[in-house]
Regions:
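Core RecA-like ATPase module of SF1/SF2 helicases and allied nucleic-acid translocases
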Residues: 5-230
Length: 230
């Protein structure tokens, strides 16, 4: 929006009326539990810290608790249909068949859990089959060169991919390869401002508590607010 662009420009130039613009444009509000109620489907909460009541870990736990869709557990972790995710560092190698390849599914790529299925329960080959909607369409994929398959598309035309994560590490894997027993993504209702660099969302909520307000530099704040499209 025009107001949002003006705010970005205001912050970038470090003008004196930044606080006035934040308050007048209804871009700021006192911190209370209402911040945890999603305003948009494509929304993220950005934090500077992991611990504490309004830290990343607690917010992710709370918001996943409020997701009433079906779930599956893997150790201490659990995953629910509808959970937003970010692919992590292991994704860069998890989905390729040759280290010389440029990964198509990579670290810091957005997605959402569409479905999952437990296969071979109780067997040495036990694994979870995940269906993940990613944030872009994939075309002309050579299935022999990737460790996933495109199984469909969302209403917006983005791809839904399917892959499997094994419970046990294969004896065929060596230490140089990413284990197919590592889940290549993390739950991401909330992420760090640093992690959000390069990402965009329709709605962004930035948590600034008294404990960390002095740590929010101009650069960090500008990075955070420019993640929002709307």
């Amino acid at each position: 929006s025009k107001q949002l662009l003006e705010l970005w420009d205001n912050v970038r130039k470090m003008q004196d009326d930044i606080l006035d613009r934040l308050q007048a444009g209804e871009y700021s509000a006192p911190l209370d539990p209402s911040v945890l109620k999603p305003a948009e489907d494509n929304e993220i909460i950005l934090c500077l810290n992991y611990g504490g009541l309004y830290g990343i870990n607690n917010i992710n736990h709370f918001m996943q608790e409020n997701n009433n869709e079906k779930e599956i557990r893997r150790g201490i972790q659990r995953y629910k249909v509808g959970d937003p995710i970010l692919f992590n560092d292991s994704a860069d190698l998890f989905f390729i068949t040759d280290k010389s390849q440029i990964p198509i599914i990579h670290n810091n790529m957005k997605g959402k859990i569409v479905d999952f299925l437990l296969l071979d329960s109780g067997e040495i080959t036990e694994r979870i089959q995940f269906d993940i909607a990613i944030d872009r369409p994939l075309m002309n994929i050579d299935n022999e060169k990737v460790n996933f398959e495109v199984i469909g598309y969302t209403e917006k035309g983005n791809s839904i991919i399917r892959f499997e994560v094994f419970k046990n590490r294969s004896t065929d894997e060596d230490d140089e390869n990413i284990s197919k027993s590592l889940v290549p993504f993390q739950i991401a209702y909330a992420v760090s401002i640093h992690k959000a660099q390069g990402l965009e969302y329709d709605s962004v909520k930035i948590i600034i508590t008294d404990d960390i307000d002095e740590l929010i530099t101009h650069s960090i704040f500008y990075t955070a607010i420019t993640r929002a499209r709307k």
